[in-house]
A protein has these predicted regions:
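Glycine-rich, basic loop-to-helix element that forms the pyrophosphate-binding segment
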Residues: 66-82, 103
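A conserved acidic beta->alpha catalytic loop
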Residues: 21, 38-47, 94
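Short aromatic/hydrophobic "clamp" motif used to bind/position activated sugar donors
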Residues: 87
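Short, well-formed alpha-helical segments that are part of the catalytic scaffolds
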Residues: 11-25
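Conserved donor NDP-sugar-binding/catalytic core segment of glycosyltransferases
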Residues: 99-133
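A short, conserved alpha-helix in the catalytic core of glycosyltransferases
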Residues: 163-168, 172-176, 183-215
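Short, flexible, basic/aromatic active-site loop/helix in glycosyltransferases
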Residues: 137-159
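Non-catalytic, C-terminal membrane-associated alpha-helical segments of glycosyltransferases
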Residues: 233-241, 247-301
Length: 301
């Protein structure tokens, strides 16, 4: 049994579409359930879920309200309420390809050594086009973009599955614990780090997570996510979360993260120079803004 966990907060515009894409896939409805966790929605999300249930009576959907605000609280509630031995997290503002659930099910069934997996995350810009200032690094930050080719295998380097397209065996959380509720998004605040925290724990336990190119998720990107205010709040949230995450582990972990930040600044300066001499200064300037906001918050300023 697969449990698809969708944590949602005020996504009336998108929730029907993501549910519909799961329902109309190639994986049989009796082999999965949808665990929907409402994290105190104030819009018509519930009404849209009711509409989906009326239109798709063969799909098992269980609806829960998590009153503790925050994505990590909602994710943990999803784990506790799930009945499946495979837990798949799907973003509430996305859609998935028809073979999405079948891809995960087939891989876990034939590879018992795999503890977790994730697939590509492809942005869908509601504005119709990608901004000219977008770089690969900013794209990953703002849209969750993730693509490592068309062959399955271990995630390269220090990469790990995106939180909105990740599948786990339930035993993972029995081993490493639940999401850290001090990290992650909370209402309209844009913290993060809870996914990295989980995968860092998995690495320390020697667990395996695999990239599956056929488990594709399409992430809707509204125009406001491309504006300066959102960018500044998101990058500041990353720095704050990294500070909290590493200090929680210990001072040595925090110092190591500061050294990593210094190396990232060196790379940022090199890229800024590259974009300057190739007459694309907007891209370089955005990278500098990103790094500056993260560093400032990482230092607690």
């Amino acid at each position: 049994m697969i449990s698809v966990i969708i944590c949602t907060y005020n996504r009336e515009k998108y929730i029907y579409n993501v549910l519909s894409s799961l329902a109309h896939g190639t994986f049989p409805a009796h082999l999965f359930e949808i665990v929907l966790v409402d994290n105190n929605c104030t819009d018509d999300t519930h009404a849209e879920v009711d509409r989906f249930c009326a239109d798709n009576p063969s799909v098992t959907l269980r609806y829960f309200v998590e009153t503790n605000q925050g994505l990590s609280h909602a994710r943990n509630r999803g784990i506790k309420e799930s009945k499946g031995d495979i837990l798949v997290y799907v973003d509430d503002d996305a859609t998935v390809n028809p073979d999405y659930l079948r891809t995960y099910a087939d891989w876990f069934a034939s590879h018992p050594e795999t503890d977790a997996a994730g697939g590509p995350i492809i942005p869908h810009y509601e504005t119709g086009s990608e901004p000219r200032w977008m770089t690969y690094f900013i794209k990953r930050l703002l849209t969750g973009y993730l693509y490592f080719g068309n062959k399955p295998g271990p995630f390269p380097g220090d990469n790990y599955p995106g939180g909105g397209n990740a599948a786990y065996r339930s035993r993972v959380f029995e081993k490493v614990g639940l999401y850290n509720v001090e990290l992650g998004r909370n209402g309209d605040s844009l913290g993060g780090g809870e996914e990295k925290d989980i995968f860092d724990k998995m690495k320390r336990e020697g667990m395996q997570f695999i990239y599956l190119p056929q488990a594709i998720l399409y992430h809707s990107i509204p125009g406001y996510k491309l504006e300066a205010d959102y960018f500044n709040r998101l990058t500041t949230g990353i720095g704050q979360s990294e500070r909290a995450r590493t200090l929680r582990i210990g001072k040595s972990s925090y110092r190591k993260r500061l050294m990593s930040e210094l190396k990232k600044w060196c790379a940022t300066i090199v890229l800024w120079c590259f974009y300057l001499v190739t007459f694309r200064p907007q891209r370089g300037n955005m990278l500098v803004k990103f790094r500056r906001n993260v560093t400032k918050a990482l230092l607690g300023k």
